[in-house]
From Swiss-Prot:
Originating organism: Levilactobacillus brevis (strain ATCC 367 / BCRC 12310 / CIP 105137 / JCM 1170 / LMG 11437 / NCIMB 947 / NCTC 947) (Lactobacillus brevis)
Name recorded for this polypeptide: Orotate phosphoribosyltransferase
Biological or metabolic pathway of the protein: Pyrimidine metabolism; UMP biosynthesis via de novo pathway; UMP from orotate: step 1/2
Binding site for orotate: 126
Pfam families, A to Z: Pribosyltran (PF00156)
Family designation: Belongs to the purine/pyrimidine phosphoribosyltransferase family. PyrE subfamily.
GO biological process, one term: pyrimidine nucleobase biosynthetic process
Amino acid sequence: MIPAEQIATDLLTIGAVTLAPNHPFLWASGMQAPIYTDNRRTIAFPQVRTHIADGLASLIKHRYPTATVISGVATAGITHAALVADRLNLPMSYVRAKPKDHGKGKQIEGQMTASDQVVLIDDLISTGGSVLAAAKAVRKAGATVLGVVAIFSYELPDSVVNFQQAGLALTPLTTYSTLITVAQQQAKITAPEMASLRQWREDPWGWVSV
């Protein structure tokens, strides 16, 4: 298993994650956040891509040994799902945000049957909305969702509630808490910035930048 600290280091090193508690980012949700994540960058770095694929494959092999299909959440989860499915020698599928408006109107691409045991892969978990919508589509197709794995989770309170309500477990390779700890150890953030970053995770909507 690839250590969570290694994945966090990888994300920081390649600029997939940017920490800026003094100059917060505006998310699409309207939330002000001291962090911005673009895990799509990971596919451009072979060593990082390998760490992620190996880590996810190992996680699934040990946590979900009965998995019969690896399914990526479109679009960012597709590449990682393909790499993991190849390592585990399992079928792969992917789930769109909504059914196509032409052709056969498919939402799920690849082969999936009602007897399948599916593990969903996404690159990033904020509230969990995208991957939980994908899980709903898989369940509607008759298959069983064993759980969700991801590269990185913000550990936001809303995501904890949402996954509990959906009856699904989330297992990320690394987390916000681990990443900011690694960033402080590497002198990428100061002690006051660390305190601000912790406050944001506890109360993201009420957080004020330093």
